[in-house]
A protein has these predicted regions:
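Bacterial N-terminal signal peptides
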Residues: 1-2
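Mature, structured domains enriched in cysteine- and short glycine motifs
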Residues: 5-80
């Protein structure tokens, strides 16, 4: 889905993921966009420091990330 990065193999195959934040926003306009770090099994919300900043992450919809088994990196990001 537009993610030509080596870590893409670590992502859940059923979860749509995106290289660019705008792509994710367009795919899920009514859901929050999160930054998924597949190697850690976590996601960061847009209010967190590492959102979009790690070298091995990708953008995804919150609902899809949670359905695929990823969890919030902190209690604050849960449900945002």
């Amino acid at each position: 889905m537009g993610l030509p990065l080596a870590h893409a193999a670590n992502l859940s195959p059923e979860m749509p993921h995106f290289q660019f934040e705008l792509q994710a926003q367009q795919y899920c306009p009514t859901d929050a966009v999160v930054w998924v770090v597949a190697t850690r099994g976590l996601y960061n919300s847009s209010s967190e420091r590492w959102y979009g900043r790690t070298s091995n992450g990708t953008y995804a919809c919150l609902g899809d990330a949670e359905k695929a088994g990823y969890r919030a990196s902190s209690p604050v990001s849960a449900g945002q």
